[in-house]
Amino acid sequence: MISRLLSLLCLRLCVGQTDIPENGSPPKPSLSAWPSTVLPTKSHVTMQCKSPTPSKYFILKKEGFALNSVKPYNLTEETADFHFTDLRQNDGGHYTCEYYSKWPHDTPSHPSNALFLLVTGYLPQPSFQAHHRGTVTAGSKVTLQCQKAGSVLGPVKFALLKVGHSTPVQTRSSTGMVSDFSLQNVTARDSGEYSCVYYQAKAPYRASGPSNLLEISVIDNHLPQDLAASTFPPQLTATSPKTPGTMTEGYTVDNLIRVGVAAAILLIVGGFLVEAWHSERLSPNKPW
């Protein structure tokens, strides 16, 4: 058993050594952000740098300048987190991370791919609409239009956002007032709530607040029309929050149904128990 463990350990160390390219630099890490790379001012974000090999420490850089260095926090020594609180406009920009490998000693890696962080809320909100309304079937094309505020001059970039995605779905550069985003050959995975923002293409990357949400539901065109209509909600409609009264009413009806069913079951079970007890009392004693 011990010899097997030693063999596995030797294999791991050998693999770690062979992960280093011939030029002496370890493979580049990956950099991600949670909950998103597009966040409102005064919010929080965590950037995570992950290396493919055990590391001694990690460095986070913004626009090429080092901001912070931390040691890995997990047992595999392959991950480090960088926390930002109370985000401001000047926190926006391009970030990369690097790590120093343990084998060979203190060998710096190549930088990760750049991660663009956008802090919103410094320009007027855009308008957001669909070019058409009605049923959206799988395989069709959906075009969404984002329009910046008329008071904002100069070229900007537009970003299409989707609830639940940590990065923009699409980005577009534009010298005009509007930008169109096309979703080609949509599937059920494209269903969801979308919004858009626009921002300056250069530092300090001033960005608007997000537009109102627009909901897209994609219907499978292989389903019968009556089944599809009963299974999916209306398509391409702006979302409207449920009122507390409507939600409370639904919960009350459901609770009454549950209580009624439970009471009926208890009455039936109680009847069986009473009948069994009564029969036991009337039956003669059996000899031993």
Swiss-Prot record:
GO biological process: adaptive immune response; innate immune response; negative regulation of CD4-positive, alpha-beta T cell proliferation; positive regulation of cytokine production involved in inflammatory response
Keywords: Adaptive immunity, Cell membrane, Disulfide bond, Glycoprotein, Immunity, Immunoglobulin domain, Innate immunity, Membrane, Receptor, Repeat, Signal, Transmembrane, Transmembrane helix
GO cellular component, one term: plasma membrane
UniProt cross-references to InterPro entries, sorted A to Z: Ig-like_dom (IPR007110), Ig-like_dom_sf (IPR036179), Ig-like_fold (IPR013783), Ig-like_Receptors_ImmuneReg (IPR050412), Ig_sub (IPR003599)
All copies of domain Ig-like C2-type, residue ranges: 27-113, 124-217
Transmembrane segments: 259-279
Subunit structure as annotated in this protein's UniProt entry: Interacts with Fc receptor gamma chain FCER1G.
PANTHER family recorded: MHC CLASS I NK CELL RECEPTOR, T-CELL-INTERACTING, ACTIVATING RECEPTOR ON MYELOID CELLS PROTEIN 1
Record function comment: May act as receptor. Negatively regulates TCR-mediated CD4(+) T cell proliferation and activation, possibly by binding an unknown ligand on the T cell surface. Enhances Toll-like receptor-mediated production of pro-inflammatory cytokines by macrophages and neutrophils.
Protein name: T-cell-interacting, activating receptor on myeloid cells protein 1
Gene source species: Mus musculus (Mouse)
